[in-house]
């Protein structure tokens, strides 16, 4: 959405009294009185972080069986994390704050997540030889993921809370990152993005003084429908976050399209594109 400044000019006659700012005195006709200002979108932005620990695996050709190589991941490794720079008070929709994620392999081919549960997905990434850029095959990457939301509804002490979230359907938050229509686990989000329930609550509590977001809420908030009040209500404050990664003990599976001998370096880059609406 394009951010636009809007000005309004009005021609009028007026009587001036009291202490005011005024132009110089003129003879005859007083001329135009300019009334104007600006309208801007909130300064809230999405912040993103990508993992750096998935690029130093070391294996031998002896581990390849029928052109398949299993690659063990010994420690938790971040894949992608996201959080808002601040909470937003008022209507959420219409502020270019709804992120849709598209992933692609090195050649631009689309990576479509295969969701295996409400907290897990696999992605198939093309692999190439770093030396001559020839394709080597595909790499299956298992990811755990979660998303979280903190919301204060004005005057509502029941549902004002830090909660699990349902999203991911077309046009809604986290499209391409969560299983559409299935609630996610906020605790998995915190594992990967480093936030806490208290921090989530703090972002909205400072926008709604005197009101609080419960951190013991066990339910979920519905962000899977753009007509829902979570998107349209002006009487609330919201803050969202996301996280995904490869859990310790997981296995990446490389399916090679050719035999490999000697030494080579491989790479399976994932290009992340965020589209805001």
Curated annotation (Swiss-Prot):
One Pfam family cited in the UniProt record for this chain: Fimbrial_K88
Recorded GO CC terms: pilus
Signal sequence residues: 1-22
Cysteine pairs bridged by disulfides in the record: none
Protein name (database record): F41 fimbrial protein
Family assignment from sequence similarity: Belongs to the fimbrial K88 protein family.
GO annotation terms (biological process): cell adhesion
InterPro entries, per database record: Fimbrial_K88_FaeH (IPR003467)
UniProt KW keywords: Fimbrium, Signal
Functional summary from the UniProt entry: Fimbriae (also called pili), polar filaments radiating from the surface of the bacterium to a length of 0.5-1.5 micrometers and numbering 100-300 per cell, enable bacteria to colonize the epithelium of specific host organs.
Keyword Cytoplasm carried by entry: no
Subcellular location per the Swiss-Prot or TrEMBL entry: Fimbrium
């Amino acid at each position: 959405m394009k951010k636009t400044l809007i000005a309004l000019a009005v021609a009028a006659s007026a009587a001036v009294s009291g202490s005011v700012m005024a132009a110089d005195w003129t003879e005859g006709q007083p001329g135009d009185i300019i009334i104007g200002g600006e309208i801007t979108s909130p300064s809230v932005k999405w912040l993103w972080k990508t993992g750096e620990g998935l690029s130093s695996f070391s294996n031998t050709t002896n581990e390849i069986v029928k052109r398949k190589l299993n690659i063990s991941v010994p420690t938790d490794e971040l894949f992608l994390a996201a959080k808002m720079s601040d909470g937003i008070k008022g209507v959420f929709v219409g502020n270019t704050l709804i992120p849709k994620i598209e992933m692609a392999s090195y050649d631009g081919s689309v990576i479509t997540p295969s969701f295996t549960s409400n907290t897990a997905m696999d992605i198939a990434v093309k692999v190439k030889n770093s030396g001559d850029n020839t394709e080597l095959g595909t790499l299956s990457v298992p990811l755990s993921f979660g998303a979280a939301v903190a919301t204060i509804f004005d005057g509502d002490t029941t549902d004002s809370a830090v909660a699990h979230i349902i999203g991911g359907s077309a046009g809604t938050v986290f499209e391409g990152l969560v299983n559409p229509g299935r609630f996610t686990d906020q605790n998995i989000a915190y594992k990967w993005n480093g936030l806490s329930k208290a921090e989530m609550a703090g972002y909205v509590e400072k926008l709604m003084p005197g009101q609080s977001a419960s951190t013991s809420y066990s339910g979920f908030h519905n962000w899977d429908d753009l007509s829902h009040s979570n998107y349209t209500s002006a009487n609330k404050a919201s803050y969202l976050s996301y996280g995904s990664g490869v859990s310790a003990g997981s296995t990446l599976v490389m399916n090679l399209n050719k035999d490999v001998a000697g030494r080579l370096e491989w790479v399976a880059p994932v290009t992340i594109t965020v589209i805001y609406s």
